[in-house]
C-alpha cells in the first residue's frame, strides 16, 4: 500500500505533459513579446483651470501618425491544444504623452489540431495599467489580432502577429507652454487607436 501511495504521489507531482499522460502539450507557458505601435487616431477631452483662473473645456480629435515600441513578458496556461489564457505585463509608449506599465489578460485561439505544427491564431486582449509620469493614473486598453505561430519544438514557439488596439489614458496638460498642476485638472482623457506588428517567443 505504501508503495502504491508513493507512486501516486510522484505521478501527481510530475506534469502530465512530461510523463506523457493525457495531454501531449505543455500546460504552462512563459515568454516575451516585442512590438511596433503605429498610432493613427487620437481624441481628447480636457477640463481644467487655466493659470488666469478661468475654466477651460477643450475637446477634439485628429488623424496623425506616431511611432512607438512595446515589450512584454507573459505567463499562461494552455486550456487545451487550441486555447491559451495568459497574463501580460510590460512597458509601452503612447505617442508623446508618456510611457505606461500595462497589465492584461489575453485569450488566444489556435487553428489546427497538432500543436507541433505551424498554426495561425487569433486573440483578444483586455487590461489596465499605470501611466509613468509625475502623477500616475490608470489606463484602459483593449486589442484584437491574429498571427502565425512557428513550432520550433514541443515547448518553444515563435509567433508573428498584427493587431488593432484602443487605449484610454490621461496625459499631462500643456497650456501654452505651462504644465497645468494635477490639482487644477478635472478631466484629462485621451483616446488612441493604433495598430501593432510584433513577434514573441514562448516556452
Where would I find each of the regions flagged by the language model?
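Cleavable N-terminal export/targeting peptides
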Residues: 1-27
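Conserved long hydrophobic alpha-helices within structured protein cores
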Residues: 28-39, 100-106, 161-163
Amino acid at each position: 500500500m505504501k508503495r502504491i501511495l508513493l507512486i501516486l504521489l510522484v505521478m501527481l507531482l510530475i506534469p502530465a505533459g512530461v510523463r506523457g499522460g493525457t495531454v501531449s502539450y505543455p500546460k504552462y507557458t512563459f515568454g516575451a513579446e516585442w512590438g511596433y505601435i503605429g498610432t493613427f487616431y487620437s481624441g481628447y477631452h480636457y477640463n481644467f483651470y487655466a493659470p488666469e483662473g478661468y475654466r477651460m473645456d477643450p475637446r477634439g480629435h485628429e488623424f496623425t501618425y506616431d511611432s512607438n515600441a512595446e515589450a512584454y513578458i507573459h505567463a499562461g496556461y494552455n486550456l487545451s491544444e487550441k486555447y491559451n489564457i495568459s497574463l501580460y505585463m510590460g512597458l509601452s509608449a503612447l505617442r508623446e504623452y508618456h510611457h505606461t506599465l500595462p497589465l492584461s489578460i489575453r485569450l488566444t485561439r489556435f487553428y489546427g489540431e497538432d500543436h507541433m505544427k505551424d498554426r495561425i491564431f487569433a486573440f483578444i486582449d483586455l487590461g489596465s495599467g499605470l501611466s509613468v509620469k509625475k502623477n500616475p493614473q490608470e489606463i484602459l486598453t483593449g486589442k484584437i489580432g491574429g498571427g502565425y505561430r512557428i513550432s520550433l519544438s514541443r515547448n518553444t514557439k515563435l509567433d508573428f502577429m498584427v493587431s488593432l488596439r484602443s487605449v484610454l489614458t490621461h496625459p499631462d496638460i500643456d497650456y501654452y507652454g505651462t504644465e497645468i498642476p494635477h490639482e487644477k485638472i478635472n478631466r484629462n482623457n485621451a483616446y488612441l487607436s493604433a495598430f501593432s506588428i510584433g513577434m514573441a517567443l514562448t516556452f
